[in-house]
């Protein structure tokens, strides 16, 4: 199954500063944004995962067995 990617209008890549080059898709309940010019990626876990993190802590990753 092909992953449907959407472009984010007006977004600028924080790494290469290219505008209108950011594509977004959802994979395993995680939003992924990637620059199609330089390959820079940003990931954000879903709200449920963020709610389990205490205020002064950070999460490196969440294990989802398949």
Curated annotation (Swiss-Prot):
This is Uncharacterized protein YheV. InterPro entries: YheV. It holds the Pfam family DUF2387. It comes from the Bacteria.
């Amino acid at each position: 199954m092909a992953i449907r990617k959407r472009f984010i209008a007006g977004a600028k890549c924080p790494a290469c500063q290219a505008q209108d080059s950011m594509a977004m898709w959802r994979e395993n309940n995680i939003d992924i944004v990637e620059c199609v010019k330089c390959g820079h990626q940003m990931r954000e876990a879903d709200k449920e995962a963020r709610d389990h993190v205490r205020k002064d802590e950070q999460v490196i990753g969440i294990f989802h067995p398949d």
